[in-house]
A protein has these predicted regions:
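N-terminal regions of proteins, emphasizing targeting and processing segments when present
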Residues: 15, 19, 31-33, 42, ...
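Short glycine/serine/threonine-biased micro-segments
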Residues: 16, 94, 98, 213, ...
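Extracellular glycan-recognition regions
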Residues: 25-239
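Small side chains
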Residues: 18, 82, 215, 257-259
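A short, hydrophobic C-terminal helix/tail in secreted or cell-surface proteins
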Residues: 241-261
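Gram-negative bacterial Sec-dependent N-terminal signal peptides
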Residues: 2-23
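Hydrophobic alpha-helical segments
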Residues: 10, 21, 79-80, 93, ...
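Short, charged juxtamembrane terminal tails flanking transmembrane helices
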Residues: 264-267
Length: 267
């Protein structure tokens, strides 16, 4: 019986060693910060024990709770995961997320980030359902009565896509949903309860996406919990070659020499 039969699995294992598994790491939300339209304090974000969950308790203007740590300023190449739940039955407005967000960008005259928002019920001119919008331009124009385009996705909040299944379906009171957000310079993906709802590429957009932080978003909706937040580094788009272990060439030479000797003895 050929020795190769026994050595082949060992060779394969040696090649694969070091490829490494990807693991989700808990996110410490104590380094995150609130920004509110017009003035900070539009939302009250209270980090919960364990530091990987937060509850937003104010019904007010658009508010963002974003990763303000130096490491969090570049979220591209990462996936943010966790759960979202509206804990009350008393309102029906917007919950969601931001991608590629910079400090105080919600009040910028030159904003450029992405908004994922989900409304429970129609409320003219706002409609229910899950949507992705490009927030681009002067947001100081949105601070008037009714907070402008935040309500109905009017410029400079420019709707780009709606959820495949939830595009016209609102969230339910006191129901926990899981979410996974993929963000690279070329791709935004939104999964809800394991189902891909939105997949939007730089080709769809016409250019690559601007980098920035992950964040949570509420508008006119209180008692929203984001829980069990984790972050995972995504594998590269083009997988890098796995380097050969240092001893592998000698192992292969030995296998070749053994085979040559067996053939010579059999001759």
């Amino acid at each position: 019986m050929s020795m190769l039969r026994y050595l082949y699995p060992a060779v394969c294992a040696a090649v694969l060693t070091g490829a490494g598994a990807v693991h989700a790491a808990p996110v410490d939300l104590t380094g995150w910060a609130e920004n509110g339209l017009v003035n900070n304090g539009a939302g009250i974000w209270t980090v919960q024990p364990g530091n990987d969950s937060v509850i937003q308790s104010r019904n007010g203007n658009p508010t963002v709770f974003y990763d303000a740590t130096p490491a969090g300023a570049s979220a591209q190449g990462e996936q943010l995961s966790g759960s979202i739940e509206v804990l009350t039955t008393g309102d029906d407005d917007f919950v969601g997320f931001v991608l590629g967000y910079q400090n105080n960008e919600i009040n910028s005259t030159t904003a450029d980030f992405w908004l994922i928002d989900w409304k429970q019920n129609d409320q003219n001119p706002a409609v229910d359902g899950l949507a992705l919008s490009h927030v681009f331009g002067d947001l100081t124009t949105t601070s008037g009565s009714g907070t402008g385009g935040w309500w109905n996705h009017a410029d400079p909040i420019n709707e780009a896509a709606r959820g495949t299944n939830l595009g016209s379906t609102g969230w339910n009171d006191q129901q926990k949903y899981t979410f996974d957000l993929t963000f690279t310079e070329d791709l935004i993906e939104v999964f809800v309860d394991g189902q891909l709802e939105i997949s939007y590429s730089s080709t769809d957009h016409g250019s690559t996406f601007t980098d920035g932080s992950f964040g949570f978003y509420n508008f006119s909706q209180a008692q929203v919990e984001y829980a069990g937040i984790t972050q995972t580094t995504l594998p590269p788009t083009t997988p890098a070659a796995v380097p050969l272990p240092a001893g592998l060439p000698l192992m292969l030479v030995g296998i070749g020499a053994f085979g040559w000797m067996r053939r010579r003895q059999a001759a």
